[in-house]
Amino acid sequence: LGCGSGAIAVALAARDPGLQVWAVDSHARAVEATRVAAKLNELENLQVVLTHTAEVPEPGTFDLVTCNPPYFADFEIARRFLDGTVRALKSGGDCILVTKLPNWYREHAGQWLEDVEVWTSGNYHLVRGRRA
């Protein structure tokens, strides 16, 4: 969710052609950039979706959701990403989210996910959690 230019989705799809990867974003330019990257890399296992609701095809079936919500926006957007993540993931599925503001996720991500952990790499933080 929030695929942006598609770097993470393209890397996952290229790494394992057996994966089915969905890239979702609300910005048409981001979706187009991801589609171009998928085509240039000849990735038939990467589907790209433009949506403003964080809805995904086949909710409750995803093993992994990666999220890259805006770093300096209202946390209402983060809540929408987490709502969409829970709808997308199957039970036991994982979420990995990138942020520069980990404290909010440390305090609140447990409302959506269990076993929440935060890892730091430079100025970025990865938040990992699992759907019950």
What do the predicted segments below correspond to?
Residues 119-132:
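Core SAM-dependent methyltransferase catalytic element
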Residues 1-67:
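Conserved SAM/SAH cofactor-binding pocket of Class I
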Residues 79-91:
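A short glycine-rich, Lys/Arg-flanked "PGG" loop and its adjoining helix->strand segment in the class I
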Residues 100-112:
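Conserved class I S-adenosyl-L-methionine
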Residues 23, 97, 118:
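Conserved SAM-binding loop
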Residues 12, 84-85, 109:
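Class I S-adenosylmethionine-dependent transferase superfamily signal
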Residues 25-29, 77, 100-101:
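Short beta->alpha hinge that forms the Motif I/post-I loop of the SAM-binding pocket
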Residues 92-99:
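Conserved beta-strand signature within the Rossmann-like core of class I S-adenosyl-L-methionine
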